[in-house]
């Protein structure tokens, strides 16, 4: 019995679409020996620092103006992480980041981390999924506020 299907061709997951509501970026993490633990892989707590680096790079890439922290702040109110497989010292780590939703005062950010085992692009697999909830912060008033309008437009893709 023959099949009309083409032979299977492994797809690099970095080439698959990322379901975000607006712009997304791929951010490569520079792994350091201090990120590793005694088991020879990235320590679970380090991933949240990686998410922060990727989120800042994404924010800088997609907001239309230089971010003035003194006027428009954001606070992290929730971080989540699903670990799928370890990242080791000779691997490359790429984090895809974008918005998954937005409320009046909050921005939901999602991440997919891809490990290139041994640094090889042809050996790329999903390593983790993460999410962060941010709230917009009025630094002068010291309280939560509506997401800054220019951010709202670009982050939502509008």
What are these regions (language model features)?
Residues 2-27, 83-92, 100-158:
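HotDog/MaoC-like acyl-thioester-processing domains
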Residues 46-68:
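Active-site helix/loop of acyl-thioester processing domains in fatty-acid/polyketide metabolism
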Residues 71-86:
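Small beta-barrel nucleic-acid-binding modules, principally OB-folds
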């Amino acid at each position: 019995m023959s099949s009309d299907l083409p032979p299977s061709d492994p797809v690099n997951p970095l080439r698959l679409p990322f379901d975000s509501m607006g712009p997304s970026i791929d951010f490569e993490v520079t792994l350091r020996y201090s990120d590793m633990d005694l088991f020879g892989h990235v320590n679970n707590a380090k991933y949240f620092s990686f998410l922060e680096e990727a989120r800042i790079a994404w924010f800088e890439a997609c907001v239309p103006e230089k971010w003035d922290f003194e006027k428009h702040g954001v606070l992290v109110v929730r971080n989540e992480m699903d670990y799928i497989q370890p990242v080791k010292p000779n691997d490359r780590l790429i984090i895809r980041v974008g918005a998954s939703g937005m409320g009046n005062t909050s921005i939901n950010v999602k991440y997919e981390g891809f490990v290139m085992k041994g640094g090889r692009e042809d050996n790329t697999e999903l390593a983790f999924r993460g999410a962060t909830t941010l709230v917009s912060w009025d630094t002068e008033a010291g309280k939560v506020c509506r997401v800054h309008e220019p951010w709202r437009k670009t982050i939502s893709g509008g």
